[in-house]
């Protein structure tokens, strides 16, 4: 979608009633996170607030994170608590341009842009749209000079947006819910495998 020419976008608008919006215009708000100081133990020790790193964003559903921060860590840094159904995009590193979908409330580091939408249907539409556009996003980011993205670049990505009733009729949240269930099942199987291997090694 990002790589449509002006004439192609105009054709869509005129012919199908679709229209063009930037990510910033489509979303209620976009935010980047931060990393609470690693030297302040009370920001991390015993933390229960999920904190997502860019390496954990790889076209996936986020149900748990490798690290958590404390309330003090949230209050003592510029990271923000993002609501469930926020869409994520990694801005730096090997996963730059890849997308995630929050199935939990979570904070993120500074290498992630969080995109908050009006509805679950719009969030799901944005998630799948950005996945579809990844190759074009990679080509156009910073003129192709480097792999890193900026929040400003993400805010200005063009989306082809159908009328609200069309987005609702696609029932994309049902696909997201099935992905969440599948992810939970994978976690259960991983835990069973870990338990079985631990029992075998103790014999």
Say what each PLM segment does.
Residues 1-34, 46, 156, 160-203:
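Non-catalytic DNA-recognition/assembly elements of restriction-modification systems
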Residues 16, 50, 62, 106, ...:
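Residues that recognize and position ribonucleotide moieties
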Residues 21-73:
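DNA target-recognition patches
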Residues 37-40, 100-102, 172:
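Short beta-alpha junctions and helix-cap segments that line functional grooves
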Residues 53-54, 64-131:
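A short beta-sheet element
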Residues 92, 106-113, 144-168:
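A short glycine-rich beta-alpha junction/loop motif
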Residues 99, 123-125, 137-139, 166-170, ...:
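Extended hydrophobic-aromatic, low-complexity segments
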Residues 118, 122-153, 157-159:
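Short, positively charged
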């Amino acid at each position: 979608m990002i790589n449509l020419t002006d004439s192609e976008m105009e054709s869509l608008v005129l012919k199908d009633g679709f229209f063009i919006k930037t990510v910033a215009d489509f979303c209620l708000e976009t935010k980047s996170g931060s990393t609470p100081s690693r030297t302040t133990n009370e920001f991390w020790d015993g933390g229960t607030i999920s904190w997502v790193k860019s390496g954990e964003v790889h076209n996936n559903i986020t149900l748990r994170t490798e690290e958590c921060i404390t309330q003090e860590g949230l209050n003592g840094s510029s990271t923000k608590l993002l609501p469930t159904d926020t869409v994520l995009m990694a801005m730096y590193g090997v996963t730059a341009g890849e997308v995630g979908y929050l199935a939990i409330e979570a904070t993120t580091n500074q290498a992630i842009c969080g995109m908050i939408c009006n509805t679950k249907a719009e969030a799901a539409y944005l998630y799948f749209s950005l996945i579809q556009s990844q190759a074009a996003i990679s080509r156009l980011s910073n003129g192709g000079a480097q792999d890193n993205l900026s929040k400003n670049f993400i805010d200005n990505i063009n989306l082809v947006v159908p009328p609200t009733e069309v987005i609702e009729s696609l029932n994309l949240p049902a696909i997201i819910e099935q992905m969440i269930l599948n992810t939970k099942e994978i976690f259960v199987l991983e835990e069973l495998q870990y338990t079985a291997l631990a029992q075998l090694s103790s014999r």
